[in-house]
């Protein structure tokens, strides 16, 4: 049996999509030294080649791809979006605005000067900033009629120009941002590690980027004469065992009766006590606890140690420091703090925001008691609330249909902004109501990534047919402008942050990369700083930058 592969792919668009995705994702794993191409570039390269070979793609699939992507971006931003302006919030907003306003101005004037075709400039700007939301916003403005297509062009040609501009500029934007992260600290003679240490001392944060996480363990000891001598008649509160070692007494057996001791309890000879703590905490116990006194008793040691992810919800906790939680009162152990999917530097003086996720371990009832105080335990269900997911998706589309008229001018939000807003609403409500709108993070990541990959396939196949023609005609101009638009806004943001806002350099670099939403560069800065301190800045600008970039895409295509 003979199979015409070309004909098969042309007649089966779904098969074509997944063939392109499979090849592209494999290419994305290729590394050049420490630089990995990444999924977006791999899929983009593959789809460009396939597009050049004459394969095409259904526009409806492209549309649903970008709609799912932008909706999921909103859901992820929702929990932290309204609390982002705590502490350094105005700085993060200013940096995001500097990057985008400078990029828009440079794109507009350079494109006007060189006479780039309509749509090329918006696509180029999206690629130069490696910001798919810009491309989404621009394309949606065209589809919804917010942006007027020139009379000598049709919508298909403009979308093609968008795709070509994005494809030619994307690699330039990615490489330039990675080079910025590598070179600017050296050229400015900035020691990011010292900057991270400085902010850590000011705010009481840990700087270690490589931290091992253990579960607490339980050990039981019999109280003997040596331990009674050591306690000197003090009660448990006065002894401060937790403050000194990190262990706490979870159970005590006296005269055969098991009980949970309070702070007023005084140890007596013959008591058997169960202590919970990390392995190194047990090692810090006074020798009078351990020397020949360990007890192996099933009932005494039968404690259920759990590890839970607690989402911060309480208004009384948001905006306060981690130390205000008084974890020692609950006998709980903090393993890590995650904000906007970024692991934060962890120590007692970090300021908490709504939507932060605290990974806490300890005896089950104690962990649940802590969760009731600060928020709720993240649902460990694999089932998503598809009713809420779909309902808010519909709401976003309805938002996009709203049109406002000012005199002779009509203006609407469009699908991109509408879905972004409804996604933020769902994410925010989910952070405040644990049983509503739950979507497992893995499922959300898959939908977002798959939507983005569908979108990339459509972009590449649309641009591939004319990519070499455009490269020979305007390739040098587009690549040159892309380099300018990629580098100068970041440089201006650095100057503003360093000299006008006087930001700590470790936070500043993280914030600039967050404003560019460029995760690969974030890893490089963390490596330079030998710390996760820059992640504080990244998390600060990331959510607001995603929102502003979608609006910027709509704006740049309207003024082009």
Swiss-Prot record:
Gene Ontology cellular component terms for the protein in this record: plasma membrane
Membrane topology reported for the UniProt record: Multi-pass membrane protein
Superkingdom of the organism of origin: Bacteria
GO biological process terms on file: potassium ion transport
Keywords: Cell membrane, Membrane, Repeat, Transmembrane, Transmembrane helix, Transport
Stretches assigned to the RCK C-terminal domain: 203-292, 293-376
Membrane-spanning residues: 5-25, 37-57, 66-86, 91-111, 155-175, 386-406, 409-429, 450-470, 478-498, 506-526, 539-559
PROSITE patterns: RCK_C
UniProt keyword Transmembrane present: yes
Localization per Swiss-Prot or TrEMBL: Cell membrane
Annotated family: Belongs to the AAE transporter (TC 2.A.81) family. YbjL subfamily.
Protein name: Putative transport protein VS_1837
């Amino acid at each position: 049996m003979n199979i015409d592969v070309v004909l098969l792919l042309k007649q089966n668009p779904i098969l074509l999509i997944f063939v392109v995705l499979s090849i592209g994702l494999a290419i994305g794993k290729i590394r050049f030294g420490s630089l990995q191409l990444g999924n977006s570039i791999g899929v983009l390269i593959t789809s460009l080649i396939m597009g050049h070979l004459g394969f095409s793609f259904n526009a409806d699939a492209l549309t649903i791809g970008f709609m799912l992507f932008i909706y999921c971006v909103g859901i992820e931003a929702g929990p932290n979006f309204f609390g982002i302006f705590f502490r350094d919030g105005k700085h993060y907003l200013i940096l995001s605005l500097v990057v985008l306003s400078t990029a828009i101005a440079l794109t507009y004037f350079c494109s006007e000067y060189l006479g780039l075709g309509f749509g090329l400039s918006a696509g180029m700007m999206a690629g130069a900033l490696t910001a798919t939301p810009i491309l989404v916003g621009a394309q949606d403005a065209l589809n919804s009629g917010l942006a007027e297509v020139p009379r000598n062009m049709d919508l298909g040609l403009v979308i093609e120009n968008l795709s070509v501009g994005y494809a030619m500029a994307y690699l330039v934007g990615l490489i330039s941002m990675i080079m910025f992260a590598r070179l600017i600290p050296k050229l400015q003679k900035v020691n990011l590690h010292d900057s991270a240490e400085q902010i850590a001392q000011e705010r009481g944060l840990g700087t270690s980027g490589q931290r091992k996480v253990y579960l607490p363990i339980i050990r039981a000891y019999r109280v003997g004469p040596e331990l009674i001598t050591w306690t000197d008649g003090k009660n448990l509160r006065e002894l401060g065992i937790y403050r000194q070692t990190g262990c706490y007494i979870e159970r005590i057996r006296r005269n055969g009766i098991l009980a949970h001791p309070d702070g007023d309890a005084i140890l007596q000879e013959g008591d058997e006590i169960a202590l919970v703590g990390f392995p190194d905490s047990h090692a810090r116990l006074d020798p009078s606890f351990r020397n020949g006194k360990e007890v192996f008793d099933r009932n005494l040691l039968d404690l259920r140690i759990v590890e839970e992810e607690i989402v911060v919800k309480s208004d009384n906790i948001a905006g306060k420091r981690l130390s205000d939680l008084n974890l020692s009162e609950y006998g709980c152990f903090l393993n890590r703090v995650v904000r906007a999917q970024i692991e934060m530097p962890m120590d007692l003086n970090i300021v908490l925001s709504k939507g932060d996720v605290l990974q806490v371990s300890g005896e089950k009832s104690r962990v649940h008691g802590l969760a009731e105080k600060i928020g709720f335990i993240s649902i460990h269900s694999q089932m998503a609330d598809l009713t809420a997911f779909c309902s808010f998706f519909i709401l976003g589309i309805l938002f996009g249909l709203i049109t406002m008229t000012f005199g002779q001018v009509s203006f609407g939000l469009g699908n991109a902004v509408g879905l972004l807003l409804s996604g933020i609403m769902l994410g925010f409500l989910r952070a405040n109501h644990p049983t509503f709108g739950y979507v497992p993070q893995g499922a959300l990541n898959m939908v977002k990534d798959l939507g983005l990959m569908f979108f990339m396939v459509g972009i590449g196949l649309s641009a591939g047919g004319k990519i070499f023609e455009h490269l020979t005609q305007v390739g040098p101009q587009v690549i040159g402008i892309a380099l300018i638009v990629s580098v100068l806004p970041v440089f201006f943001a650095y100057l503003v942050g360093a000299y006008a806002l006087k930001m700590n350099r470790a936070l500043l670099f993280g914030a600039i990369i967050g404003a560019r939403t460029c995760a690969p560069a974030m890893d490089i800065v963390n490596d330079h700083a030998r710390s996760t301190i820059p992640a504080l800045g990244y998390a600060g600008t990331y959510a607001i930058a995603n929102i502003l970039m979608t609006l910027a895409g709509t704006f740049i295509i309207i003024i082009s």
